[in-house]
Amino acid sequence: TACGFSPLQIVALRVLFAAVLMTAVIFKIDPKLLKIRWRDSWLFIGTGIFSLVFFNYCYFRSIESSSISIAVLLLYTAPVFVMLLSIFLFREKFTRCKMLALLSTFCGCTFITGIFSSKMTLTLEAFGFGLASGIGYALYSIFSKLALRRYNTLTITAYTFYFAAIAALPMAEPLQLFTLLADLRALIGAIAIALICTVAPYLLYTRGLQDVDAGQASILATLEPLVAAAIGIFIFGESLTTAKILGMILILSSIFILNTAKN
């Protein structure tokens, strides 16, 4: 945002450069991985548009309507939707361990976001967009799990970014977007965000879905606010509060619970 990009433009840049990077990687490894059956496009419309673009749009609208803390907390209702959908679609069991891990994760996110530390108002609009962002976030796990029955992790990730870029660019004022990219600092930043914050996590998460239940994977992904809190403390000098410590412990506890159940 320091370079003048709006939140939606940042999303468009992320997926656009991620698509370019993924294409380069696949051409290097095996160009045949770019081949898909076009009747399977609905899978990638699901991961790219109904999930990636939709949840980002709703997430930013939720922030505009309330606060970052509320938006983040509602976004991380995603594991609930993943687990509910997985019961019907993949016949995954909703065990006591999963329920405990889910509660521990949600409570941990509540403490880390500091939602109770200040006076905040939750409007119906903010709640609606926040909950929608959680549903959109959850859909990536569902559509990816379905796509993994037919396609390689690299293929799924690449086509997710292709379809996301097609949907996001028209909404991101492309003329202004590419004008701002003339700044070398903005270009380097966009490439870094695409590689570190988009390609790497989506590749790893999609690969993880091959070996882990969608519900478990969605809970493990809630490490994100914990990592964000740690970066804020150690790099940006944010205060380490009792609430944050408790939140981190709760999120780590959910991973311990899932690991214990697996063993």
Feature-to-residue mapping (PLM):
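Membrane-interface helix termini and inter-helical loops of multi-pass transporters
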Residues: T1-G4, L33-L34, R61-E64, T113-E125, ...
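Helix-helix packing/entry segments at the starts of transmembrane helices
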Residues: A12-L13, L52, N56, I70-T77, ...
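Specific transmembrane alpha-helical segments of multi-pass solute transporters/efflux pumps
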Residues: T23-S69, F111, A194-V212
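Hydrophobic transmembrane alpha-helices of multi-pass small-molecule transport proteins
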Residues: M22, L85, F94-I115, A168, ...
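Membrane-helix interface residues
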Residues: G4-F5, S66, E92-F94, Y151-N152, ...
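Transmembrane alpha-helical core positions of polytopic small-molecule transporters
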Residues: T47-N56, A78-P79, T113, S133-S141, ...
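Residue-level recognition of membrane-helix boundary sites in multi-pass small-molecule transporters
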Residues: Q9, I70, K93-K98, T155, ...
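Hydrophobic alpha-helical transmembrane segments of multi-pass integral membrane proteins
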Residues: L8-V25, G46, A101-C107, E125-A132, ...
